[in-house]
Amino acid sequence: MTDLVAVWDVALSDGVHKIEFEHGTTSGKRVVYVDGKEEIRREWMFKLVGKETFFVGAAKTKATINIDAISGFAYEYTLEIDGKSLKKYMENRSKTTSTWVLRLDGEDLRVVLEKDTMDVWCNGQKMETAGEFVDDGTETHFSVGNHGCYIKAVSSGKRKEGIIHTLIVDNREIPELTQ
């Protein structure tokens, strides 16, 4: 029998990670799974509230599951990523990254640009890139298979919007994924 009480999907640069938490309130068991792999297992934890901290993804992003009693034997489980609630983390992340999803040569691809470092990730792999200044901004070039790709960065001309990033694959613009 499983004591699965919470499941979260966390989008990081190297992909979307599934975090699952088992809490056996009668057995004292706590188990954390990341992408189906057991990360933490504790038995006989008779203090039923508390927290479990672990790391997720290629960048070893810190994650914490908080276990709080809400009434009697009812519990609330919240996930923090890098010290922020999952909701707040995802809101901040949407400001610091751009994400595109496309199908190329029969394969689903997820391309992520980290705006602060200009690092580009494709399906969990950090890509080798080459930056180039062009008349109206910059282009960050990389390859996926034998396909030429680049992310064009141009000013929106509006302070509130900032820089607009566009993914071009084989001279075709790919729409950005909105969260």
From Swiss-Prot:
Function: Plays a role as an inducible effector molecule that mediates Fas resistance produced by surface Ig engagement in B cells.
Protein name as it appears in the record: Fas apoptotic inhibitory molecule 1
The organism's place on the tree of life at top rank: Eukaryota
Single Gene Ontology BP annotation: apoptotic process
Organism, scientific name: Mus musculus
Tissue expression remark: Widely expressed, with the highest levels in brain, thymus, kidney, and spleen.
Species classification: Eukaryota, Metazoa, Chordata, Craniata, Vertebrata
GO-annotated cellular components: cytoplasm
Major localization class: cytoplasm
Keywords of the record: Acetylation, Apoptosis, Cytoplasm
Compartments, as annotated in UniProt: Cytoplasm
Modified residues (N-acetylthreonine): T2
